[in-house]
Amino acid sequence: MKIYKILNNNVVTILNNNDKESVVMGRGIAFQKKKGDEIDDTKVEKIFVLENNNVNDKFLKLINDIPVECIEVAEEIISYAEEKLETTLNENIYLTLTDHISFTANRYKNNMEMKNSLLWDIKRLHRQEFNIGLKALSIIKDKLDLNLPEDEAATIAMHILNGELNQDMPEIVNMIKVTEEILKIVKYHFNIEFDEESINYYRFLTHLKFFTQRLFNGNYYEDYDNELFDMMSIKYPESYECVKKIKKFIYDTYGNNLTKEEMLYLIVHISRVISSK
């Protein structure tokens, strides 16, 4: 690999076999190097191979407009998130999170603090992503010497959710709000307080994360087993009544009708979560 551009001692760009520019990172990778020099492969830590040409072009433009340190911070956060979540995030997050970190760094250096109105909801409903957000604050503190509040951990968690579910940020906000409303319906229907440390509660939240994704994508589970639905609605009549309230809420708010298959999964999860209250 030959250096095409040097951004700093740790970040360069190359041209691949298709003359497509890519970013390469590694400690000291460009030290005492110039354009056209060969890269020491042993120093390569990360090559940004972004398959989407539009995303790649925007990323290359972005890295020319922001401090390279913000790119390094974003990459470390994304790598940590993918390791913890055991998944590959949508590559668009390299754009959105890098840009957000640069914007946030400038804002806080100018004493412009912003609150996240969904902080409490994200802490409760998306703990794994929020904990990644907290780790991100530690990385930002170490690399950029900025002490950021938990509000920023929540915002970074939303970017992680965006990368997980491939949803736009307004949809992520709506997904969080819908999840909160569904939990309220269950809570007040059964007059209970959830055991938020129980495995059944965690599984319910995980189900709701992907249920709300399907809601906004319009990709519901299709009806395959009406007999099982009938059996479970009889076996768990109160959970069924609760799910009917959820169905009405979703129809009244978003105009979407839940399939019996979606209702079946909700009945099962609600029955489990109320058993561990």
Residues of each region from the PLM?
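A cross-family "folded-core" feature that marks the main globular domain of proteins
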Residues: 1-277
